[in-house]
């Protein structure tokens, strides 16, 4: 334990100011996202909508990535990842303001599409931005730390989000499940997103050449479109596995176990904590077993964790949800680092956008179908489908060549 702690402190001491700025952004944006993740479905319910509408909104957001994912990648390669990230954050703020003030369902759907577009632009730009400020030998570590930065703060956001409606209701004299309470609570995420933009507003310094890198690695030939697509393929099934459940995660724990908003917030906080710890867990495993093998087997482990959620007791279900977060959180930074390592710098925007497109496609279709399935058969088929999708995504990683 002492050795691990010493290694961690040494690794953190080697991080450049550019990396610390990105980590600060990820923590703040992760805090904002955790609030919207918990409260938006409750907001829809307070407006009188049901699970199928929640699935529709999730599908609309992910469809934006599906439709605009490739143009987003071209934009990132054209204007640069930092400018793209800032543009995405500004658009995200404007779209959320419009969403909360929209007078009708159709206006909300349009605003949600813009929210999805902005989110895809922001998160897609972050991947090549990180790849551009670190050398190959540090990439897995930095990607894991960045995933942890955004996810470890998630429990704080989930707990705050669970308490915000009650606190706001007391302040304005309404009920904790009233529209006004949820609307004002969601507005806090808009403020946090604006603060998250501050660390990345200033340009990043040019990365010095890596003295340990070979000339062949520095001058890698361009990959064909199909080669890049093959590296991104695992994202499709990862999107399916997330889309069938994550848009409904709060409704699952509320409806299946009768939990309050605050209790649901605690459960989601544990999952976010698992995601954050997973990012740290994946770093030493990737170093020991390689990015491909570690990423693939860690994602495979998410399947039995999902099956644990079939147990009709809150503690086993919550434990399964935590473990799912742990294994997914450990696997996806390794897969992202693997793709960026295999892709020449001039194609990283394309590679990141393809991962986003496939992930969005899987999520959008899965969320829409899942909302319909739940109305007739409940959550059991959803959990089984997620497990199968995690297995398929893991196999897609394991079938890649080398690290």
Task: Report each predicted region and the residues it spans.
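Juxtamembrane intracellular "pre-TM" segments in multi-pass secondary transporters
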Residues: 2-16, 204-234
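Helix-loop boundary and gating motifs at the non-cytosolic
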Residues: 8-63, 227-267
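Central cavity-lining transmembrane alpha-helices of secondary-active solute carriers
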Residues: 56-74, 269-281
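Conserved MFS/SLC helix-loop-helix module at the cytosolic interface between two early adjacent transmembrane helices
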Residues: 67-103, 286
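Helix-to-loop junctions at the C-terminal end of transmembrane segments
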Residues: 68-80, 165, 278-291, 374-375
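Helix-breaking motifs and short loop linkers at transmembrane-helix boundaries and internal kinks
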Residues: 80, 101-106, 258, 311-316
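Structural signature of the two symmetry-related core transmembrane helices
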Residues: 83-98, 293-308, 384-387
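C-terminal membrane-cytosol helix-exit motif in multi-pass small-molecule transporters
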Residues: 166-169, 190-211, 396-401
């Amino acid at each position: 334990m002492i050795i691990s702690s010493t290694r961690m402190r040494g690794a953190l001491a080697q991080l450049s100011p550019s990396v610390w700025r990105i980590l600060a952004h990820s923590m703040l944006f992760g805090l904002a996202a955790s609030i919207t993740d918990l409260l938006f479905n409750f907001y829809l319910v307070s407006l009188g909508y049901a699970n199928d509408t929640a699935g529709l909104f999730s599908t609309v957001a992910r469809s934006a990535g599906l439709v605009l994912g490739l143009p987003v990648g071209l934009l990132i390669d054209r204007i640069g990842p930092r400018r793209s990230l800032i543009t995405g954050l500004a658009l995200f703020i404007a779209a959320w303001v419009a969403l909360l003030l929209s007078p009708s369902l159709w206006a909300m759907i349009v605003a949600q599409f813009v929210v999805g577009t902005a989110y895809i632009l922001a998160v897609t730009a972050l991947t090549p931005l990180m790849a551009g400020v670190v050398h190959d030998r540090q990439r897995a570590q930095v990607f894991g730390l960045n995933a942890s930065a955004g996810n470890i703060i998630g429990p704080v956001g989930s707990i705050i989000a669970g308490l915000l409606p009650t606190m706001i209701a007391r302040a304005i004299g309404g009920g904790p499940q009233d529209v006004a309470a949820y609307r004002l609570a969601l507005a806090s995420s808009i403020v946090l997103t604006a603060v998250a933009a501050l660390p990345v507003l200033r340009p990043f310094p040019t990365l010095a050449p890596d003295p340990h890198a070979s000339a062949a690695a520095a001058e890698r030939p361009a990959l064909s479109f199909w080669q890049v697509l093959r590296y991104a393929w695992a994202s499709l099934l990862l999107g399916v596995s997330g889309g069938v459940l994550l848009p409904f995660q709060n409704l699952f724990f509320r409806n299946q176990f009768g939990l309050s908003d605050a209790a649901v917030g605690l459960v989601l906080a544990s999952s976010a904590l698992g995601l954050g710890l997973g990012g740290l867990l994946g770093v030493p495993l990737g170093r020991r077993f390689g990015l491909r093998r570690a990423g693939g087997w860690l994602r495979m482990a998410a399947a039995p964790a999902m099956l644990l959620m079939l147990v009709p007791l809150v503690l086993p279900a919550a434990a399964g949800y935590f473990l799912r977060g742990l294994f997914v959180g450990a696997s996806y930074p390794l897969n992202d680092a693997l793709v960026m390592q295999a892709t020449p710098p001039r194609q990283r925007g394309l590679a990141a956008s393809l991962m986003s497109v496939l992930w969005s496609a899987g999520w959008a279709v899965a969320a829409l179908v899942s909302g319909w399935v739940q109305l007739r058969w409940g959550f059991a088929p959803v959990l089984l489908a997620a497990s199968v999708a995690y297995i398929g995504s893991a196999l897609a990683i394991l079938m890649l060549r080398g690290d």
